[in-house]
Design a protein with these regions (language model features):
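Glycine- and aromatic-enriched membrane insertion/assembly motifs of diderm outer-membrane
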Residues: 48-79, 116, 121, 276-279
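Transmembrane beta-strand segments of Gram-negative outer membrane beta-barrel proteins
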Residues: 17-29, 66-74, 179, 227-233, ...
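Bacterial Sec-dependent N-terminal signal peptides
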Residues: 1-21, 309
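Outer-membrane beta-barrel biogenesis signature
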Residues: 16-21, 56-64, 208-224
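Feature captures outer-membrane beta-barrel proteins of Gram-negative bacteria and organelles
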Residues: 44-53, 100, 159-165, 192-202, ...
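Outer membrane beta-barrel transmembrane domains
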Residues: 34, 81-83, 203-309
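N-terminal ordered "arm"
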Residues: 20-59
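Outer-membrane pore/translocation modules
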Residues: 24, 72-218, 229, 240-259
Length: 309
């Protein structure tokens, strides 16, 4: 249903707008996008987001945009290819239902700061078993078993921050390099991470780029078309992951939990196209081993579609 709404919005051809203050987007993660017959670990995720430009003042030396956003989403986690035998499980079965609110500050020097809070629910209350089994039955996929071992219900709250800064841009304007860092502290994910981001192609300044959701503009501003490839390796030091370790505050976290690998390298390679109202992004993500078990490294694909108005 959500995809149909977005396709209708994209197909709509209205009069040219002198400002775009709002954006709706849908984001989908799935290891099936890799076409390697894999259905395991972080196996599916979907989220819907709304962003609004709330303030733009480019008159000051440290001119900036302010954009706030909200996101609701759902994630599914399985053991290796859905194995139900307890002895073969290398990751907990669980689902995560969440909502997030954030605010971003984007500066003329092409640095940015994003602060947010996320509240979520793990366990049966996140409806992972019903959603996954219903989807598999609808499309005639294999039978899922193992949800009887899922993590216990628990609520999480995280505070998150992300900072990025432009390091250099080529004289042609077709290549740039930025440094990005992120941090999360809470009951779900606690980590710190940092790494470079390389972009190649037709680029906008980072305060008007799809890369950080800043293409929204008021009257008198022009945001050009973008078309670029990007590569983002980021090294994380991880303190807690509730999808693997269970509820931090629970004594009985569930029948299957594991410890986490503290160091993880996450690499993303992708392509973005953005023009007028529409933004489309597709990327692949490759993570090194996350779980202290027989679980292997994991990878998945992502697709995002946004419509600004």
């Amino acid at each position: 249903m959500g995809v149909c709404i977005f396709l209708c919005l994209i197909a709509y051809k209205g009069r040219a707008q002198t400002e775009l203050l709002h954006e709706l987007s849908i984001h989908s993660d799935n290891d099936a996008y890799l076409f390697i017959n894999q259905d395991q670990y972080y196996t599916n995720g979907i989220s819907f987001s709304y962003r609004q430009l709330v303030d733009k003042d480019f008159s000051a030396a440290s001119a900036k945009k302010k954009i706030w956003g909200i996101t609701i989403g759902h994630k599914l986690y399985n053991a290796y290819n859905g194995f139900s035998e307890l002895v073969l499980m290398d990751r907990p079965f669980t689902a995560y239902l969440y909502g997030r609110a954030s605010k971003a500050w984007l500066y003329r020097d092409e640095s940015s700061l994003n602060l947010g809070a996320e509240v979520g629910l793990y366990g049966k209350g996140a409806f992972g078993e019903a959603l996954q089994e219903g989807f598999h039955n609808l499309f005639g996929f294999y039978e899922i078993s193992g949800w009887e071992y899922q993590l216990r219900d628990h609520v999480t709250l995280d505070l998150r921050a992300k900072y990025s800064r432009l390091l250099l841009r080529s004289t042609s304007g077709k290549m740039d390099l930025q440094l990005q860092s992120s941090m999360s502290l809470g009951l779900n994910q606690s980590f710190i991470g940092a790494g470079p981001v390389l972009r190649l192609g037709k680029l906008n300044a980072l305060y008007a780029s799809a890369y950080n959701g800043s293409r929204l503009f008021q009257k008198g501003e022009v945001v050009n078309k973008e078309r670029y490839f990007y590569y983002r390796p980021m090294l994380f030091y991880r303190l807690y992951d509730a999808s693997i370790q269970g509820g931090m505050l629970l004594d009985d976290k569930g029948p299957v939990t594991f410890g986490i690998k503290p160091w993880m390298l996450s690499q993303i390679v992708g392509f973005t196209y953005a023009h007028r109202h529409v933004t489309i992004d597709a990327h692949l993500q490759f993570n090194t081993k996350e779980v202290k078990s027989n679980a292997t490294a994991h990878q998945f694909g992502s697709i995002s579609i946004g419509y600004a108005f």
